[in-house]
């Protein structure tokens, strides 16, 4: 199967975009051959995002979990297809932490893989913005040793002078700066998480918010 075959599989099963890239450095210790990544995403519902007000809605929390479950299923199935073709594959969960050592990050940043695959850019909010759907997406990644190349070049940041997310963030966690090339965060993940846990315990035990997604003008909610 070719890269296009596998990307077409993802698109046929619910992803709205998919791509691939070579990573600058292999992310898995002891597995240097896993230096390529499939990146793909699913779109969140406009109507559900509009239900977010001064905090997350119950509908958004459930929708968020359902999107993650779909992504994890797609990543698992893609990994199976890759292994059937004789490649190694390491699915990275849609939402995953690495314990106390890295409580706000997974095995490899989905946003980095998506940007390197030419699928979009990381905005001032720290969110990934896809070319067609803005930040109203969720991402997953599968690391592999199958050689992959981007279908499009890396996209320039498209935020311009907009700071809608900065003004709307109730935690004050968004700096309003563009992300750096060395991967330094342009928002305070700890402050974001702390605010959610303190103020949104009744919705998913403070695990989601979504305000920065709702207010982003790139999303053009219908």
Task: Please name every model-derived segment.
Residues 1-68, 73:
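Non-catalytic, usually N-terminal nucleic-acid engagement modules in DNA/RNA processing proteins
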């Amino acid at each position: 199967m070719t890269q296009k075959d596998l990307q077409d599989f993802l698109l046929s099963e619910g992803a709205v975009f998919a791509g691939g890239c070579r990573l600058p450095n292999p992310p898995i210790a002891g597995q240097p051959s896993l230096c390529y990544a499939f990146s793909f995403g699913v779109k969140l519902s406009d109507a559900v995002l509009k239900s977010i007000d001064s905090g997350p809605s119950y509908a958004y929390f459930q929708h968020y979990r359902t999107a993650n479950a779909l992504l994890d299923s797609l990543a698992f199935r893609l990994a199976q297809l890759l292994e059937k073709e004789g490649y190694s594959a390491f699915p990275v969960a849609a939402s995953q932490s690495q314990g106390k050592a890295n409580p706000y990050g997974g095995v490899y940043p989905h946003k980095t893989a998506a940007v390197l695959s030419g699928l979009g850019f990381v905005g001032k909010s720290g969110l990934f913005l896809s070319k067609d759907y803005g930040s109203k997406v969720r991402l997953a990644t599968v690391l592999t040793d199958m050689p992959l190349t981007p279908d499009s070049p890396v996209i320039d940041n498209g935020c311009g002078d907009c700071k809608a997310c900065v003004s709307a963030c109730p935690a004050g966690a968004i700096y309003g700066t563009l992300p750096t090339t060395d991967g330094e965060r342009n928002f305070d993940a700890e402050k974001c998480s702390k605010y959610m846990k303190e103020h949104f315990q009744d919705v998913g035990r403070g695990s989601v918010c979504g305000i920065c997604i709702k207010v982003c003008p790139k999303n053009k909610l219908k």
